[in-house]
From Swiss-Prot:
The keyword Membrane applies. It holds the Pfam family LRR_8. The chain crosses the membrane at residues 609-629. GO terms for biological process: adult locomotory behavior; auditory behavior; auditory receptor cell morphogenesis; axonogenesis; cochlea development; innervation; lens development in camera-type eye; linear vestibuloocular reflex. Its main location: membrane. In adult brain, highly expressed in putamen with no expression in cerebral cortex. Expressed in adult and fetal lung and fetal liver. Also expressed at high levels in some brain tumors including medulloblastomas and primitive neuroectodermal tumors. This is SLIT and NTRK-like protein 6. It is a single-pass type I membrane protein.
Length: 841
């Protein structure tokens, strides 16, 4: 009977156990309670971010299905052996932003299918030989932003398929030989470490297939040891992406790029050194005359090794070691000396409520880790004595208040972790004094507002993490003047994000994360779409998916057409983005018209082409303006010259005509009525003098016809003219100028100056007497003789006075040599120089 009862109970227990196990195997594991699960392309995505998970064993997954597991921002502090043995189908595991300080050997056993492992932003200090045991198929390993100082020689020896290794922002001083001998790396990131050199033998020779090598922000010593790296970099194929190696020492090379330095300047011909060590251990006292630093350091080492040889030096050598037993370390923390980085202080998860619990502060701290404590506020006086800090980790605390100026003395700080706290608002005063800060981590807070100018006190900020907050808008010019290269705005509350005055200030951007926001794919998002399309391929890390309107849910923003986002948008073919920029407005900013036009031009035409075109247009305008100015000046000069010529013609004595000797009509002169008593009797008496070859052919024909008609009467006319003029009171025998003398001058024109022979004499007489006295004297002399001999010549005298005292009429006469001879031929007496002088004055 007892036997049957025992069998019954055994079968009952077996059924109960079988019944209890069956739901576990058939259920969806942690997807029903702890985590969020989603299936995509046949792979289960298990999201367990920020669930307060302390142990990996708390996770259960569906059986026989490949999955990706995310354990971001939890409370993991250590990975124990076989922690992942039940996750054999995992192909990707994300353990970032925890406080993992140690990984036991065999922790990754059973993950033979794993291809990606993320252990970034933790507290790892060492990578041991068997740390990654069991990850034979691993292709991607991310271990950046830890405190790794040591990598053991065989740490990566079993990772025969590893292609991407990210180790930036650690404290690695050197890499062991042959560390990558069996690793087919194509991408290696070593930025932000303490490396001084990379040898060819044992390191560079094993990464010949590298495509992307990042080496910035290290402590490179540009000396002879770095020549191998320089030569190797120069021989790399042009398609490889190699970061700049910037010298940190010696001082005269600090800030210089290695590739731009000459080999002779980096490593001049090294001098020949003497041997410093003697096999017998004796000291080389003769070497003290040398001033070489390396010799002095070597000599000091030999002294320390031989205390028995110099007993008198023992007190001086041992005294410093007795005075410095070790660095001081606060009681709840662990400290480690990192040469040359300084003192590393580990105070994570020590239930520290305030930094005042660490007093007195240690000397020369470089890195202070306070992650995972219960600090609620940070006051201005808490960090006054930590001015030597280069890294401060305050992540995963309960900080709600950051007093303004709390970091005022941390002028050397380069990395600041404030992730996983309770901050709700950021202002400029919180970050005063952080002049050298390059990395700022503010993810997993409750930040709703960022005031304008918050990041201005950090002129060297490169990396900014603001993901997993509650941000909806960003103030204008929030990134202005900040050289950001990496920005994470993932998992916030952005429905749209203006490009103008916000995103367009990110001139040095290389990576931005905008996914997992409730994007409203409407007209307000057209500017963001066009900005994303202009970025390089890998700048935007993940897809930006629309949340609203409903018909665009889960649609990728970059792949949508602008007309779908904004149906009323009309694009101009020549300027495809001008209208969109004019129509898209945001509540946070107002778009300037000039800025809109300039932006539309730069969208349609490359900026370099636009600048070149504007330059050519400017040069063309300058030349046109100069040509117009020259033309105006030339025409003005010609006009002035013409006026001067006309004035000279008006004032020239050659143009004066005396009506008493007849009137002449040239080819430029208009006919006037006769103004002389003798004009009707004067018919060109000197035709042979008047002819000139400068006249036109028509004029010459008229002259020839006239000569043919009057040729026979020329002598008769000349003789009658002379006889008539002899009876004139002006040319009579009683006058000063006799007819015989004038006839001689009139007939001989060999001397061209005969017309003005007496001008100088009469001018002197005029200057002595004056115009009035001169006229009175001459008229008084002429009047009695004329009345005596020619009582009827009174009218001629009045006519002469009228001509002398009145201004002669202007005649448009061209001053030519022919007219000059013609005028001289028509004058039967010397011209009255008084009238000429009066005209000139």
């Amino acid at each position: 009977m007892k036997l049957w009862i025992h069998l019954f109970y055994s079968s009952l227990l077996a059924c109960i156990s079988l019944h209890s196990q069956t739901p576990v195997l058939s259920s969806r594991g942690s997807c029903d309670s702890l985590c969020n699960c989603e299936e995509k392309d046949g792979t289960m995505l298990i999201n367990c971010e920020a669930k307060g998970i302390k142990m990996v064993s708390e996770i259960s997954v569906p059986p026989s299905r490949p999955f990706q597991l995310s354990l971001l921002n939890n409370g993991l502090t250590m990975l124990h052996t076989n922690d992942f043995s039940g996750l054999t189908n995992a192909i990707s595991i994300h353990l970032g932003f925890n406080n993992i300080a140690d990984i036991e050997i065999g922790a990754f056993n059973g993950l033979g299918l794993l291809k990606q492992l993320h252990i970034n932003h933790n507290s790892l200090e060492i990578l041991k030989e068997d740390t990654f045991h069991g990850l034979e198929n691993l292709e991607f390993l991310q271990a950046d932003n830890n405190f790794i100082t040591v990598i053991e020689p065989s740490a990566f020896s079993k990772l025969n398929r590893l292609k991407v290794l990210i180790l930036n922002d650690n404290a690695i001083e050197s890499l062991p030989p042959n560390i990558f001998r069996f690793v087919p790396l194509t991408h290696l990131d070593l930025r932000g470490n303490q490396l001084q050199t990379l040898p060819y033998v044992g390191f560079l020779e094993h990464i010949g297939r590298i495509l992307d090598l990042q080496l910035e922000d290290n402590k490179w010593a540009c000396n002879c040891d770095l020549l191998q790296l320089k030569t190797w970099l120069e021989n790399m194929p042009p398609q490889s992406i190699i970061g700049d190696v910037v010298c940190n020492s010696p001082p005269f090379f600090k800030g210089s790029i290695l590739s731009r330095l000459k080999k002779e300047s980096i490593c001049p011909t090294p001098p020949v050194y003497e041997e410093h060590e003697d096999p017998s251990g004796s000291l080389h006292l003769a070497a003290t005359s040398s001033i070489n630093d390396s010799r002095m350091s070597t000599k000091t080492t030999s002294i320390l090794k031989l205390p028995t040889k110099a007993p008198g030096l023992i007190p001086y050598i041992t005294k410093p070691s007795t005075q410095l037993p070790g660095p001081y370390c606060p009681i709840p923390c662990n400290c480690k000396v990192l040469s040359p980085s300084g003192l590393l202080i580990h105070c994570q998860e020590r239930n520290i409520e305030s930094l005042s619990d660490l007093r007195p502060p240690p000397q020369n701290p470089r890195k202070l880790i306070l992650a995972g404590n219960i600090i609620h506020s940070l006051m201005k006086s808490d960090l006054v004595e930590y001015f030597t800090l280069e890294m401060l980790h305050l992540g995963n605390n309960r900080i709600e208040v950051l007093e303004e100026g709390s970091f005022m003395n941390l002028t050397r700080l380069q990395k600041l972790y404030l992730n996983g706290n309770h901050l709700t608002k950021l202002s400029k005063g919180m970050f005063l004094g952080l002049h050298n800060l390059e990395y700022l981590y503010l993810e997993y807070n409750a930040i709703k507002e960022i005031l304008p100018g918050t990041f201005n006190p950090m002129p060297k900020l490169k990396v900014l993490y603001l993901n997993n907050n509650l941000l909806q808008v960003l103030p204008p010019h929030i990134f202005s003047g900040v050289p950001l290269t990496k920005v994470n705005l993932k998992t916030n509350q952005f429905t749209h994000l203006p490009v103008s005055n916000i995103l367009d200030d990110l001139d040095l951007l290389t990576q931005i994360d905008l996914e997992d926001n409730p994007w409203d794919c409407s007209c307000d998002l057209v500017g963001l779409q066009q900005w994303i399309q202009k970025l390089s391929k890998n700048t935007v890390t993940d897809d930006i998916l629309c949340t609203s309107p409903g018909h665009l849910d889960k649609k990728e923003l970059k792949a949508l057409n602008s007309e779908i986002l904004c149906p009323g948008l009309v694009n101009n073919p020549s300027m495809p983005t001008q209208t969109s920029y004019l129509m898209v407005t945001t509540p946070a900013t107002t778009t300037n018209t000039a800025d809109t036009i300039l932006r539309s031009l730069t969208d349609a035409v490359p900026l370099s082409v636009l600048i070149l075109g504007l330059l050519i247009m400017f040069i063309t305008i300058v030349f046109c303006a100069a040509g117009i100015v020259v033309l105006v000046l030339h025409r003005r000069r010609r006009y002035k010259k013409k006026q001067v010529d006309e004035q000279m013609r008006d004032n020239s004595p050659v143009h004066l005509q005396y009506s008493m000797y007849g009137h002449k009509t040239t080819h430029h002169t208009t006919e006037r009525p006769s103004a002389s008593l003798y004009e009707q009797h004067m018919v060109s008496p000197m035709v042979h003098v008047y002819r000139s070859p400068s006249f036109g052919p028509k004029h010459l024909e008229e002259e020839e016809e006239r000569n043919e008609k009057e040729g026979s009467d020329a002598k008769h006319l000349q003789r009658s003219l002379l006889e008539q003029e002899n009876h004139s009171p002006l040319t009579g025998s009683n006058m000063k100028y006799k007819t015989t003398n004038q006839s001689t001058e009139f007939l001989s024109f060999q001397d061209a100056s005969s017309l003005y022979r007496n001008i100088l004499e009469k001018e002197r007489e005029l200057q002595q007497l004056g115009i009035t006295e001169y006229l009175r004297k001459n008229i008084a002399q002429l009047q009695p003789d004329m009345e005596a001999h020619y009582p009827g010549a009174h009218e001629e005298l009045k006519l002469m006075e009228t001509l002398m005292y009145s201004r002669p009429r202007k005649v448009l006469v061209e001053q030519t040599k022919n007219e000059y001879f013609e005028l001289k031929a028509n004058l039967h007496a010397e011209p009255d120089y008084l009238e000429v002088l009066e005209q000139q004055t």
